[in-house]
Swiss-Prot record:
It comes from Streptococcus agalactiae serotype III (strain NEM316). InterPro entries: UPP_synth-like, UPP_synth-like_CS, UPP_synth-like_sf. Binds 2 magnesium ions per subunit. This is Isoprenyl transferase. Homodimer. Substrate binds at residues 27-31, 39, 43, 71-73, 75, 77, 198, 204-206. GO terms for molecular function: ditrans,polycis-undecaprenyl-diphosphate synthase [(2E,6E)-farnesyl-diphosphate specific] activity; magnesium ion binding; manganese ion binding. It holds the Pfam family Prenyltransf.
Length: 250
């Protein structure tokens, strides 16, 4: 059991640590605007916040941390901003992977990665290769990821198996569909997020893990992502500890 001490030294027991946490990292642009800085500086500050949250989650015993780094819809942003965002994984992996590796963190990526710029793709591959034997927290980047597209592709794969008589339609189950999703590379028990956190005060999923989040608990906070640090993660988990997960039962 972990004990989280608030600033007033009130001890809060953390009986339940969510095995899989998903984070929609939102508010980088607004963070920069409040400080009269370019939007790209918010993304850079968000990168530093991610490193702190990852190490904190690892220390708490979280098994998987899936972070929404770039959606399939984000390509519609201004070209200069997209170019900067695409360079962030290169900078993040080069700067922080040695520390992640030291903390036994394994880097993994889901999404349509073949459409990424070569430098981004290569940096991602280097990080995954360097940490592939680590057995601690899985830092799972959703990069050029879209939930509807993921489900559509799973349906296409299953339909093709039926067309080729490799699969009987009566044998299609939820587990079979899940096995065709990108999260099938995660440990079986931890594929679905127990807790999804969204920063910046927005109250929507934005196409993030729609299948996997069917029974997730949600935590929405007005805190902008660059300001979401270790203490904010603890607050989210304290809130999670006050929930009773029913999974559809009474």
């Amino acid at each position: 059991m972990f004990i989280f001490k608030r600033k007033k030294q009130v001890e809060m027991p953390l009986e339940k640590i969510p095995a899989h946490i998903g984070i929609i990292m939102d508010g980088n642009g607004r963070w920069a605007k409040k400080r009269l800085k370019p939007r790209v500086m918010g993304h850079k500050a968000g990168m530093d916040a991610l490193q702190e949250v990852t190490i904190a989650a690892s220390g708490l015993g979280v098994k998987v941390l899936t972070v929404y780094a770039f959606s399939t819809e984000n390509w519609s942003r201004p070209d200069d901003e997209v170019k900067f965002i695409m360079n962030l994984p290169v900078e993040f992996f080069d700067k922080y992977v040695p520390e992640l590796d030291k903390n036994n963190v394994r880097v993994q990526v889901i999404g349509d990665t073949h459409k990424l710029p070569k430098a981004t793709y290569d940096a991602m591959q280097r990080a995954c290769l360097r940490t592939k034997h680590n057995s601690g927290l899985v830092l799972n980047f959703a990069l050029n990821y879209g939930g509807r597209s993921e489900i559509t592709n799973a349906i296409k794969e299953i339909a093709q198996d039926v067309l080729e008589a490799k699969l009987n339609p009566d044998d299609i189950t939820e587990d079979l569909v899940a096995n065709h999703l990108m999260t099938n590379s995660l440990p079986y028990l931890y594929r679905d997020p127990d807790l999804i956190i969204r920063t910046s005060g927005e109250l929507r999923l934005s196409n993030f893990l729609p299948w996997q989040s069917a029974y997730s608990e949600f935590y929405f906070t007005p805190v902008l992502w660059p300001d979401f640090k270790k203490d904010e993660l603890h607050k989210a988990i304290v809130d999670y500890n006050q929930r009773h997960r029913r999974f559809g039962s009474v």
